[in-house]
């Protein structure tokens, strides 16, 4: 062991009395390893004892302590986390062993702060919540704190949505979305979560009253930043399974007014194009073709191939009418 590791105060397991009955099991790389990994002596020591425990299948409190030390060395090691869950399940069945599961949550909270995008930590957290904690507002509070730090943490969003669908505690979700959008209205993760919430709280397809409310919500953000794609995508999603021209015909007039105001905005033109195509009349399809040309040649030439494809598709649609 290096002097620096000794100076850190690390005590090898071979010098810990409570581990004197365990013979460490070294990693076997074969007689002539081509490219052996240069693990630190501390890491090798911990893993050697973990291999021994894994072989003996011991499940006890001291194993939890060992696993915590190994996890600190390599938080992404799936096998360590898996065996930790097996130990926790075994301890639960043993009436002679007491273990406060809050200790597990404390470990996860601490590790989540230093490694917030580690999948294994979040996977283990879900296991603990589902098996031992259940519906607990503290979990939502914890997630709100994580998302305030990084509102694009996929694992945090995934865990929150699992929590909501499992325990059905939707209180305050839209308010939380509003708060995060006030901090960054371009965050597509937040828009996605809002859609997730309203989709779970309302029938599908959405009723007109909800659509009108959410369209106005999207417009409030669009007026602030018309080239922000997120609210436009959200707006289009509100009409999934329904025709805009049928359920909300007045929307076209609103969009045409916005089109004249937000010159060069591809998003408003794209939705107008879709509505015209839905109407499926000679005039509306001709208007669609004009928009396709405008988008491909002037407003959005980077997606020229797509708009040309749309142009050809609508041209074929127009031929069926003529």
From Swiss-Prot:
Record keywords: Magnesium, Prenyltransferase, Repeat, Transferase
Keyword Magnesium: yes
Keyword Magnesium among UniProt keywords: yes
SUPFAM superfamilies registered for this protein in UniProt: Protein prenylyltransferase
GO terms assigned for molecular function: CAAX-protein geranylgeranyltransferase activity; protein farnesyltransferase activity; protein geranylgeranyltransferase activity
One cellular component (GO) term of this entry: protein farnesyltransferase complex
Quaternary structure (record): Heterodimer of fntA and fntB (farnesyltransferase). Heterodimer of an alpha and a beta subunit.
Name by which UniProt lists this protein: Protein farnesyltransferase/geranylgeranyltransferase type-1 subunit alpha
Upper taxonomic lineage: Eukaryota, Amoebozoa, Evosea, Eumycetozoa, Dictyostelia
Primary gene name: fntA
